[in-house]
Amino acid sequence: MNRTNKDLFEQYALMGKALSNSNRLEIMSLLIQAPKTVENIAKETELTVANASKHLQTLLKAHLVKNRKYKNYIYYEVFDENIEKLLTLFFETAQEQLTKANAIIESFAQPSEEEYILSIEDLEEKMQKNEIVLVDVRPSEEYLTAHIPGAISMPVQELEKRIASLPKDKEVVAYCRGPHCLMSEEAIMILEKHGRQAVRFSQSVNDWNLHHVAI
């Protein structure tokens, strides 16, 4: 193998190494939703600002993220659409493998016996028939960045106060950042507590977009 190829593989390894850390993977899972400041990232990941900044510098060097200044803040975002697709596929594949192993996921979020898997095709069919109301329970800035068409923005922290505005004659489908995110699980608990029929859509906006690019 020539030197050029070795150099390329060293660059590939740099990217792989940058992702071989649970904190950095969590940061990337946030950034594929919307650009965020170091302070936002630190708060959502429960890291110190200094530690979050250090992880972001590693991701910058690996060309996985980029930053831009807006007013007095520096925002970090996924480097480009290809990195977003790569991460979406990675999280989706990892989730499938973990589900097959039936170990970590059970300790992370135990589904109810009544829960069923709602596919993208199922969701589209229900939306076309006007059978459901789709609720995006992520923070509002993530909804504004990208959301599933037809979804209503209702952050999980606001859900209980706004639940009366949801139609009572329709099933509520809640989604958040994907299978690793528990905000939609919390939303289902709140909805069911108020006597609403609700189900979780475990896939993300990125999964939705990737599905429609593929067909």
Language model: regions and residue ranges:
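Amphipathic alpha-helical dimerization/coiled-coil segments
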Residues: 2-10, 88-130, 136
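N-terminal helix-turn-helix DNA-binding core of bacterial DNA-binding proteins
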Residues: 11-50, 74-79
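Alpha-helical residues within the helix-turn-helix
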Residues: 43, 60-61
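Conserved catalytic core of two-component sensor histidine kinases
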Residues: 53-54, 185
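Short, hydrophobic-biased segments on the C-terminal half of alpha helices
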Residues: 56-57, 74
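Beta-hairpin "wing" of winged helix-turn-helix
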Residues: 61-70, 77
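Catalytic cysteine-centered active loop of the rhodanese-like fold, especially the PTP/DSP P-loop
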Residues: 64, 166-209
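Positively charged, proline/Ser/Thr-rich regional signature most characteristic
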Residues: 124-180, 186
